Amino acid sequence: MEGTPSGAAPSSALAAVLKHSSALPPESAQVQGYDFNRGVDYHALLEAYGTTGFQATNFGRAVQQVNAMIEKKLEPLAVDEDHHEDLTQSRRPLTGCTIFLGYTSNLISSGIRETIRYLVQHNMVDVLVTTAGGVEEDLIKCLAPTYLGEFSLRGKELRENGINRIGNLLVPNDNYCKFEDWLMPILDQMVQEQNTEGVKWTPSKMISRLGKEINNPESVYYWAHKNHIPVLSPALTDGSLGDMIFFHSYKNPGLVLDIVEDLRLINMQAIFAKRTGMIILGGGVVKHHIANANLMRNGADYAVYINTAQEFDGSDSGARPDEAVSWGKIRMDAQPVKVYADASLVFPLLVAETFAQKADAFRAEKNED
């Protein structure tokens, strides 16, 4: 190049490639992964995620968020603090942080059911939100098992054999027949109580009743019933439960489920909470229902999303936490985290680093009906 001394690199290229850096903030963490020369220490391995980068670092931040929720939840309240127990419509005592857990139905179909059951059994969360499948699949598993299969199994052949596929899980259709046999007498009883005792059924009351009737400690909703943890499912008819309610309406019509009372219930849990935390696995109605309840208090104090959805189609499922901040569903001074990952991989690890580390601090499970 003209003007460049022989044997010297072009000055413009040198300036571009060897541009000097400004100093990073002093609190910037250095990237450092786990050193397996230390042996296999799973707690230390998961701690190292925080400085590993990418979604591992988001996982580490999610651990911090959930531990912050737990720390506030376990703080003793002042004696003169107003509990608003008459307004929340809940039999659960107020704590320093009300934790909302939302999850889609496929997670109950999977082995994440057992992780969720652990949290509910030990009173670690305060409000559950799920879909119809998130209720019925738990109950059905008490009647018959779900099996591992393959994502690649052909739908035509499965249908011919009465096998339903949920990703790489298989549910024999006979399971739903057993569910119908179990559920129909309960629906009959609910209609009778509605007509003779004036019982006003809601989705949450129905789910609590089903948890009582299943009477199986393997069930999420058995423990939700015992520990007075409300389970909200605004789309309760969108699944096998809805199919059974539909069929039952011909045999014994008249069952009414009031979703407005449940709307007041979840909103009041947020409004009168001292602080709130959201842990949301997946997207759709469960994600928005929890976030919208927290709008009623000008946003949640803590939030963790775990899902694989992207924001580029404008979906609520894919929306990052910052979009919820714009709506007032997460507080402006919060530090929410989204982990872009399959919850079946991440959620048990998150519980292992948070709730399970503090199991002794939570009150003993209740055992009365």
UniProtKB/Swiss-Prot annotation:
Q: Which NCBIfam families match?
A: dhys
Q: What does the UniProt keyword field contain?
A: Hypusine biosynthesis, NAD, Transferase
Record has NAD as a keyword = yes
Spell out the molecular function terms from Gene Ontology. Answer: deoxyhypusine synthase activity; identical protein binding
Which lineage do the record's taxonomy fields give for this organism? Eukaryota, Metazoa, Chordata, Craniata, Vertebrata
Q: Which GO terms describe its cellular component?
A: cytoplasm; cytosol
Indicate the residues that form the catalytic site. Answer: K329
Q: Does the keyword Nuclease apply?
A: no
Q: Which cofactor does it need?
A: NAD(+)
Which family does the record claim for this protein? Answer: Belongs to the deoxyhypusine synthase family.
**SUPFAM superfamilies from the xrefs?**
DHS-like NAD/FAD-binding domain
Which E.C. number(s) belong to this protein?
2.5.1.46
Binding-site positions, spermidine: E136, E137, D243, H288, G314, S315, D316, E323, A324, V325, S326, W327, G328, K329
Name the Gene Ontology biological process terms.
glucose homeostasis; positive regulation of T cell proliferation; spermidine catabolic process; spermidine metabolic process
Q: Where does NAD(+) bind?
A: 105-109, 131-133, 137, 238, 283, 308-309, 342-343
The chemistry this enzyme catalyses reads: [eIF5A protein]-L-lysine + spermidine = [eIF5A protein]-deoxyhypusine + propane-1,3-diamine
One Pfam family name from the record? DS
InterPro entries, A to Z: Deoxyhypusine_synthase (IPR002773), Deoxyhypusine_synthase_sf (IPR036982), DHS-like_NAD/FAD-binding_dom (IPR029035)
The entry's protein name is: Deoxyhypusine synthase
